[in-house]
A protein has these predicted regions:
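Polybasic, low-complexity RNA-engagement segments
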Residues: 147, 157-266
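Mobile active-site "lid"/loop adjacent to the S-adenosyl-L-methionine
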Residues: 19, 33-73, 90-98
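S-adenosyl-L-methionine
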Residues: 1-29
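Conserved Class I S-adenosyl-L-methionine
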Residues: 31, 59, 67, 98-124
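Core SAM-dependent methyltransferase catalytic element
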Residues: 33, 135-166
């Protein structure tokens, strides 16, 4: 679902891995920002889904909180010094929100600092607060549009602030296109000189140069199921374009790679 949504967005500077959070932590100190959309007890779905109400239990809340604590710790390891951590759930109870943050702050003592404060207009109906260095936001369904959720932000204390370099895999996980294929693929994109192309299972994908190295590194460490912009397949040297290419909105601004991870990992 996440990979399909990325294609609908029309962006190409994205990699979608499917991994356990402990595997994401292999990229220690690499990410500028990590968003943890944690699996939760789903109290924000009570109004919308009957099964959310019938499946809820105190034991389920405790289980979710334990899982959330583990995910946060692995995400923190993957975040570089000076990086930003965002935490969110679609539930309202203290245990899975401020309670998890409180336990995390004990575990990460001395490593956190407040993120830049976000000014929130009272007319928006958002309930703002704080838990230690975390700035917190509660979105209640009777105050805002939607079913409601919880969010919080904190920054990792800068200790040099440098991103850790992750060793490149000995073998390049991406099969880069040959010259003949490149000539055909370049006809379909703007700024072709800024792109590289790779084939995966007979389908070609395009990567902006600043993204290509990052995706190659990620593919050597994580289980990346989608990345770049799907170009299509070549038949007798002519591209049969993929639907994703029609949705492609063009080059990213700033030369950064977005990483979308399912399961609340990162």
């Amino acid at each position: 679902v996440l990979a399909d949504n990325v294609r609908k967005w029309g962006v190409g500077n994205v990699a979608v891995p499917v991994n356990d959070p402990s595997q994401v932590a292999r990229l220690e100190g690499w990410f500028d920002a990590v968003a943890v959309d944690a699996p939760c007890s789903g109290e924000g779905m009570f109004r919308k889904l009957e099964e959310a109400r019938t499946e809820w239990s105190e034991a389920g809340v405790a289980l979710c909180a334990e899982r959330q604590r583990g995910i946060l710790r692995e995400a923190w390891r993957a975040l570089r010094p000076g990086g930003l951590l965002l935490y969110s759930t679609c539930t309202f109870n203290f245990t899975e929100n401020e309670g998890v943050l409180r336990d995390f702050l004990v575990w990460a003592a001395g490593e956190t600092e407040p993120a830049e404060r976000i000014a929130v207009d009272p007319a928006w109906g958002v309930v703002c607060g704080a838990e230690g260095d975390f700035q917190t936001f509660r979105f209640y369904p009777h105050r805002v549009e939607g079913e409601g959720f919880f969010a919080a932000a904190v920054r990792k204390r800068a200790a040099g602030g440098e991103r850790r370099r992750v060793p490149r895999p000995q073998r390049d996980p991406l099969a880069w296109a040959d010259r003949r294929a490149v000539q055909e693929l370049e006809r379909w994109v703007e700024e072709p000189e800024a792109m590289r192309f790779a084939a995966v299972g007979g389908t070609f994908y395009g990567y902006w140069q600043p993204q290509a190295e990052a995706v190659a590194m990620l593919s050597g460490v994580l289980n990346v199921i989608a990345s770049g912009v799907e170009m299509g397949q070549l038949f007798k040297g002519v591209l049969r374009p993929a639907h994703a290419l029609a949705l492609f909105t063009g080059p990213p601004r700033g030369g950064r790679v977005r990483v979308a991870a399912g399961g609340g990992a990162a």
